[in-house]
Amino acid sequence: SMSSLMESKGYYVGVDVEESSIRVYNESLYYANIIGYTGKISAEEIQSLNTDSGENKYDTTDIVGKAGLEQYYEKELQGVDGKKTVYVNNLGKVLKEDSQVDPQTGDDIYLTLKTDWQKAGYQLLEQYVAGIVWSNTYDYKEFDNSQVGTNEIVIPVYDIYYALFENNVLSVSHLRSSEATELEKKVYNMFLDKKAQLFADLKAELISDSAKPYNELSKEMQAYITYLLDTTMTELGILREDAIDTTDSTYLAWTNDESISLRDYLTYAISKDWMDITQISTDTQFLDSDEIFSSLCDYLSEYVTDDNNFSKIVYRYMIENDQLSPQIECQLLYDQGILEPDDATYQGLGDGSVYSFDFIKDKIYNLEIKPASLGLSPCSGSMVITDPNNGKTLACISYPGYDNNRLANDMDEEYFSELVTDKSSPFYN
């Protein structure tokens, strides 16, 4: 216990017990967009805040506002650190206290917002947005909304099937984990087969003397190629972004006109030293272009196996091409614990007695799948309520919210990354 440690400090060299404070936000989901959060100060913030204050008030140990009111009222909320100078022996025992400066708390800020109104307004907003999604979802694979007015927007149910993977409702990493269920393992093996086929097709395209121009490839193949070039090969340093001449006619034919093949573009890139092929193989001196491209495909295929963003593209086209049925995808919502167990419905999805379209609409209607989770349009909203007698703001609501407790103090980096990439943009509503 803390008291026993304090009593035995002399026996534990370097061990001490200190009291510390952490920031805790009540009702975080409803207030996060207003209050923001705090975090450890950065070097840039130290320089900026010290310049603004005209003194060296901040150092590397400080916690400062990172967003919302916490950031806007940083100067008012930030107190003054206390200091104590002591002399200790080699066991850490205090021998003498030399000086002490007591800490000072910052100013308090009071809001006119009413928590009950915030919560009620948030729930109403969520229900309203869910109602729009529910009423505009149709049993279509695709629909051209450019031909209709804004009040006639259609959400094809397949957009929802895609969104379950694309917006991280379903975890692609869990499908390949050691804790995966039998159904998840089955789906992952389907993914591996699909990935093997797409890289075989890509390799065939790269070594073909009659390779198609980019604009004649399928949208699916274009999606894979775009990701592999713009993201994977650039991140790995295979495609040297800083070496590419963006005014080159061949580069423009690839990026703007889309009139040349991937084979022609990469062959040219190698000749211009835009590619570092030593990353693919250490013995490249005697390889011809076909062997280089074959090695490249094998290398990329292995590398992207654990790339969640690439996996999402593959799963999307598995669904679109009916290689992964919506029925199975809906069952995964139970396997991954997104939905509460329901054996009858799970079995019905498996034998076809429960139709995936009806299932999805029912889950949206009952808010078991929420608009923010899908990140489709619409997926957000806002509401402001004021007192007509005095103009005070009683509620200032933004949907969706987030848990700012997971960002304050010791930041949850994985959660922060999820928020940044979330298609419902919780940071910006």
Model-inferred region functions:
Residues 1-428:
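Periplasmic/cell-envelope proteins involved in peptidoglycan metabolism and beta-lactam response
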